[in-house]
Amino acid sequence: MCYAVGGCAGAGPAATYVAAALQFFAASQCLLQESYPRQAHVTNGSRYDFIVVGGGTAGSALAARLAEENRFSVLLLEAGPNPPEESIVPGLRQTLKETPYDWNFTTIDDGVTSQALASHVQRQPRGKMLGGSGSLNDMVYARGHPEDYYEWADIAGDVWNWTNVLDYFKRTEHMTDSNIIRNKELMQYHGIGGAIEVSGAHYPDSPNSKLMQAFQELGFAAVDDMTYPYKIGVGKFSHTIRGGRRDSSLTAMLNKVKSGKLHVLKNTFATKILFEGNKAVGIQADSDGRNLFVYAKHEVIVSAGTFNTPKLLLLSGVGPSDILNQFDIDVVQDLPVGQGLQDHVMVLNFMTAERGTCKLSESDGYFNVIKYLYNGSGTLSYSDSIGAYLPQKDKEAHVPYFAIYPSCVPAGQLTSNLCVQGIGFTSEICEKLQKENEMHELIVAAVVLLKPQSRGHVTLKSLNPDDDPAIYSGTFDHEADMEGFPEAIEKAISLVNTTHFKKLGARVVDLTPESCRGLQEPQRTRCSVRALALAAWHAVGTARLGAVLDAELRVRGLEGLRVADASVMPTMVRGNTNAPVVMIAEMAADFIKNQYRDK
């Protein structure tokens, strides 16, 4: 999710101008050209060794790795088109949400949580284009904690332990942050020479520098590398940015493939997996309105994401038999597909500050467009995110449990579009925040539960493949997830009591819903948290290792069918999910290559 609610050029009124200017210059001077795979010509009945369904973060990486084996023919199916020019520009990372490049998923109203949000639902944006969510995310490079992967190993097999997955993280990574490279201790956990560049923050004069100082005043230790597994505190995140441009499994891996044996078919939406007995043999798809049947000699690999992967499996007869029977779908394999959904839970806290708090030394939008187009520099060329980790009370001090992600909204920049459509708040809350933002800057502190116990589920709305899946978040179904929120929020809003923010006249904006105002603490905060809960857009777990899949990501009880994307995660990792998804794709590629080495 964009924790930096106001920290990008695409968040304010200038977004339309900036995007239009970039499109004009890109068209006339080819300054933002990216060489995407050309559209393949695929006829009905075509046969490949492997079919990969979904050209997102996992699918792009997996298809690229399989294409390294010249003996394999690979077809990659992607429901969306190439990304637009804005996708490449880090400073425009907000502009693609709520557009045709976004699946625009929402959860089902459960009548209990998120009742202070518009329509009582949580937004779940996902990339509908090559690169998937890796083409519209915040580019934060995070892996989770070693404890997450030891937990996976206990569930799914030792191949998923921290020591092993670390090798795969390092394989894909090209670390370029000189502060980390110079530190031998930190470099034990990083790679150089991998496909995807991981770079440091570039602007020490940003508002985040003052926020870092404020967190240190509150007792957080300064951390040089937020992926370092044995120290937590406050620090700047690394990002997947190369030379002022978004770097991803699409730009760094799929776009570099030269093999003629990899075919990419865009605007092609898989509607059903084809089976002969218990073996997956192909895919039925809608390709630009054409009903297409394609076949796989060895395997179909589903990489359609946490929401579309279970939908496709269910429509194909793989899932809980009671759900399949409810929709009169023939049961191919009875498995807990769609069960086990998890996401990081987030609550936004707002504080006001004097004008100028959010100002960068290079703040003129027009100048920065020219600067970016001229040499790829300026504020459009970077993402400057920081975070502060809190351990669980009475647990190990180096294992994060909550995170606080602060950001800054300049005066007058919180538009209705960003507040209502972007965040999902009701118009009443947005009117209050916009009134505050007319005269003041807003400091936003996103408090995020990193290790939820609650689980939701994903199921079908109908037999129509064009219908979105039904997403039940399950937020706070496990009462333990509420524990710690009041304390974490208190820590976040105590920023107003630090030296720097006292000077700025900072104060907390009270967003307590009317239904919670009569309660005493901590029940009042708990009520507010439940009502204001947002998804952090890191959903996982709907085709889990150990339940739906074996240790090598093969669907249990079936042949020729594998899953590789965020849906395979058996439990939530303590951090953003993009890098772990690339790691999963790397492991899937090795599993497949090893299985078919002599075939």
UniProtKB/Swiss-Prot annotation:
Catalytic residues, chain numbering = H538
Tell me its EC number(s), please. 1.1.3.16
tRNA-binding found in the keyword field: no
Organism (species): Spodoptera littoralis
- Top-level taxonomic group: Eukaryota
Induction per the UniProt record? Induced by RH-5992, which is an ecdysone agonist used as insecticide.
* GO terms for MF: ecdysone oxidase activity; flavin adenine dinucleotide binding
Can you state which reaction this protein catalyses? ecdysone + O2 = 3-dehydroecdysone + H2O2
- Protein name as catalogued: Ecdysone oxidase
Q: Which residues bind FAD?
A: N137, D138, M139, V140, W537, H538
